């Protein structure tokens, strides 16, 4: 027990050593986040009100003297004080002595160690010492408190190592509750401004269960007539009236009219009014927005959800979908999640602060940038989470290790997926959702291993048979051909480019449906989806495309392969290391050839995407850029003619040029970029000359009208053309 001194009217106590050290740390160190003091004190007031409400359930007489529950703020600029008053359970003399100074809370030392280790001051409430945050802005604190079991007492301290307690007869009596009077430091007067106090209550305590009111100045203008304000002038006017009345008796009708007009003017003058300003004070409730997540979903209207969403997000549009739920049992929390109508333009900006989910603990705002609360792929979801189990003011340092938060996160993801599935039942709404947030779903496929199969059910793609409609993987599988083994897909830059790809020729001929994957993120997502409902996904631009063939077809193809073997070798010799090998294939019907990639390497589209990455790892790029495989169509007339010419003369320059031209063209039709566009252009020009029967060695004739290069430019004349 700390030492105690008595004076005739008050008792002086020394702070416990740990508390004294904590106060010294708060007063002498610099903290930028001082505004949290109000959150802590309002939270303490709310706790005190919860306690008396609980006591009143057992014994209604506890609230006979003061049946109202309230928290009130009063800023006194004249005395530089901020008062926070509540009608909670109040404190006895013993409570004031023990709770506010002589008995250290178990968390006092732990909080000091956390502060010295660099933690945020906003953690103070987590350790049960939130009251002392008052000294962040005040150099003296006065606590007036009245408990039903004791008289009214006042506690006071300037945090100078001691505090005083005495029976209170100098302050306005409390029926029950506590009144904190903060004597603000000279540089903290911003907390006397109505605007600032409203801002802090809205930010941190808007959803406290009890009404929070602020004493505000109200200016009212009233109209006062001049005759009320200036009685002397009125008397003078009356005397003038009397004199004129005596003269009126002898005047003509015309003069009577003149006098009447004069009287009207005079009457108007008499009734002339002016405005007087009166300043009054009244209580303005600050937390009018009730926490609708505390109500049952069946009790909340669509209009209330829309109003709350706009207030929460400052969005000018209504939300697209909402999920309102609560989790009870070993863990309790309530949540309200919204899907907006459109994605923010900077949704995937890496440096953007994620602040879409606001975290509350027992209606007290904690933070709005808790990245551990929801995965990145769901960062577009907006809403609130209110936990009954998390410690108040949980720190960022302990978030990642907090098991409660991990359970909340898991439930939020589950409920989001339920919400998205509900949206699929509304075709137009889901179409809007998918247009805006399909990239997020695909990012979820890439990142969320636990929910990958559920997210895959939400994916939609255009196909060779769907026209402009989007098709789900389930719909695709349900209408697969009986002899079809795989889910076929093709990746590319656009629907137009993939729709005319040579890789689709045989698949279309067999009436197999192919998925178009034209979003760059599709390349990453599809690598994680190995199969769907037991059907493996197969890229039709990579080697290993297996198609069911009859025995006769197989024998016929084997004969063609053997026949084309010399041409394959010759093409490989010409192209050298540009291709890994040259093979005969069955995937083409109309095209002579194309370039395929290895099954585990990058596709042409992925290669294009990765080359566009400015900060890519070049070592990985070279590893994944596996050699291309040239696959030729042995049934195509070009290949047959080329085989015949190569057989006649392997040194034929035209054959060599044609091989290179086929390779370059195959690069383009297969989705790759040209390695040497200039060489490709030269080959095209030679083919044009050949088609025009021009000599390949022919040079452009000299133009005699062209001045020599060594002549001055000014001497040359340009012919004028009309």
From Swiss-Prot:
ATP binds at residues 44, 86, 105, 131, 396. It is found in: Cytoplasm. Pfam families: HATPase_c_3 (PF13589), HSP90 (PF00183). A motif (TPR repeat-binding) lies at residues 718-722. GO terms for molecular function: ATP binding; ATP hydrolysis activity; ATP-dependent protein folding chaperone; unfolded protein binding. Keywords: ATP-binding, Chaperone, Cytoplasm, Nucleotide-binding, Stress response. SUPFAM superfamilies: ATPase domain of HSP90 chaperone/DNA topoisomerase II/histidine kinase, HSP90 C-terminal domain, Ribosomal protein S5 domain 2-like. Residues 219-273, 698-722 are annotated as: Disordered. Residues 233-258 have a biased composition (Basic and acidic residues). The keyword Plastid does not apply. One of its GO terms (cellular component) is cytoplasm. Residues 223-232 have a biased composition (Acidic residues). CDD domains: HATPase_Hsp90-like. PROSITE patterns: HSP90. Belongs to the heat shock protein 90 family. The TPR repeat-binding motif mediates interaction with TPR repeat-containing proteins. Molecular chaperone that promotes the maturation, structural maintenance and proper regulation of specific target proteins involved for instance in cell cycle control and signal transduction. Undergoes a functional cycle that is linked to its ATPase activity. This cycle probably induces conformational changes in the client proteins, thereby causing their activation. Interacts dynamically with various co-chaperones that modulate its substrate recognition, ATPase cycle and chaperone function. Homodimer. NCBIfam families: PRK05218.1. HAMAP family: HSP90. This is Heat shock protein 90. It comes from Theileria annulata.
């Amino acid at each position: 027990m700390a030492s105690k001194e008595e004076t005739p009217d008050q008792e002086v106590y020394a702070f416990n050593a740990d508390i004294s050290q904590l106060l010294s740390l708060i007063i002498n160190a610099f903290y930028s986040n001082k505004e949290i003091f109000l959150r802590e004190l309002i939270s303490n007031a709310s706790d005190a009100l919860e306690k008396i409400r609980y006591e009143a359930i057992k014994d209604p007489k506890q609230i006979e003297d003061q049946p109202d529950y309230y928290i009130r703020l009063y800023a006194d600029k004249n005395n530089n004080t901020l008062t926070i008053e509540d009608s909670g359970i109040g404190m006895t003399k013993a409570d004031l002595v023990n709770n506010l100074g002589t008995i250290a809370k178990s968390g006092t030392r732990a909080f000091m160690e956390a502060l010295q280790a660099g933690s945020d001051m906003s953690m103070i409430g987590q350790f049960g010492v939130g009251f002392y945050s008052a000294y962040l802005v005040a150099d003296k604190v006065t606590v007036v408190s009245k408990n039903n079991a004791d008289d009214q007492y006042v506690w006071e301290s300037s945090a100078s190592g001691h505090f005083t307690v005495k029976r209170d007869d100098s302050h306005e009596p409390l029926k029950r509750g506590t009144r904190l009077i903060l004597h603000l430091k000279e540089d903290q007067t911003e907390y006397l401004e109505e605007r600032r106090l409203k801002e802090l209550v809205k930010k941190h305590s808007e959803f406290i269960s009890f009404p929070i009111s602020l004493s505000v100045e109200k200016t009212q203008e009233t109209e006062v007539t001049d005759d009320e304000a200036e009685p002397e002038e009125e008397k003078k006017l009356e005397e003038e009236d009397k004199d004129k009345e005596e003269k009126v008796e002898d005047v003509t009708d015309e003069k009577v009219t003149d006098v009447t007009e004069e009287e009207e003017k005079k009457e108007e003058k008499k009734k002339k009014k002016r405005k007087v300003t009166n300043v009054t004070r009244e209580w303005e409730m600050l937390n009018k927005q009730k926490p609708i997540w505390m109500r049952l979903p069946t009790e909340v209207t669509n209009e209330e959800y829309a109003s709350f969403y706009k207030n929460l997000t400052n969005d000018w549009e209504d939300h697209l979908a909402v999920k309102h739920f609560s989790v009870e049992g070993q863990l309790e929390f309530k949540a309200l999640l919204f899907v907006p109508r459109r994605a923010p333009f900077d949704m995937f900006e890496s440096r953007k602060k994620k602040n879409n989910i606001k975290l509350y603990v027992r209606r007290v705002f904690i933070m709005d940038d808790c990245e551990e609360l929801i995965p990145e792929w769901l960062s577009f979801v907006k809403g609130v989470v209110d936990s009954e189990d998390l410690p108040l003011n949980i720190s960022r340092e302990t978030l990642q290790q907090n098991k409660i938060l991990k359970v909340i996160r898991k439930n939020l993801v589950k409920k989001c997926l339920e919400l998205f599935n509900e949206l699929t039942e509304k075709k137009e709404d889901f179409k809007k959702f998918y247009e805006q947030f399909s990239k997020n779903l695909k990012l979820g496929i890439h990142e969320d291993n636990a929910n990958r199969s559920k997210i895959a059910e939400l994916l939609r793609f255009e196909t060779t048979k769907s026209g402009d409609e989007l098709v789900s993987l389930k719909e695709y599988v349900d209408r697969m051909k009986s002899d079809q083994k795989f889910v076929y897909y093709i990746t590319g830059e656009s629907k137009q480019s993939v729709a005319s790809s040579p890789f689709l020729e045989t698949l279309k001929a067999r009436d197999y449906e192919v998925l178009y994957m034209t979003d760059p993120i599709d390349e990453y997502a599809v690598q994680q989806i190995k199969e769907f409902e037991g059907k493996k996904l197969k890229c039709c631009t990579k080697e290993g495309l297996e198609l069911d063939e009859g025995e006769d077809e197989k024998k016929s193809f084997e004969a063609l392969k053997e026949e084309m073997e010399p041409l394959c070798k010759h093409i490989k010799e010409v192209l050298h290391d540009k291709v890994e090998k040259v093979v005969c294939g069955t995937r083409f019907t109309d095209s002579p050839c194309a370039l395929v990639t290895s099954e585990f390497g990058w596709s042409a589209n992925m290669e294009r995407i990765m080359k566009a990455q400015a900060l890519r790892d070049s070592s990985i790029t070279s590893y994944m850029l596996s050699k291309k495989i040239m696959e030729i169509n042995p049934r195509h007339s070009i290949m047959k003619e080329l085989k015949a010419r190569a057989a006649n003369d392997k040194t034929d320059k035209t054959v060599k040029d044609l091989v290179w031209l086929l390779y370059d063209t195959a690069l383009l039709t297969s989705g790759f970029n040209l390695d040497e566009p200039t060489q490709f252009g030269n080959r095209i020009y030679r083919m044009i000359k050949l088609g025009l029967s021009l000599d390949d060695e022919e040079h452009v004739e000299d133009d005699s009208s062209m001045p020599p290069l060594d002549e001055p430019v000014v001497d040359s004349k340009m012919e004028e053309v009309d």
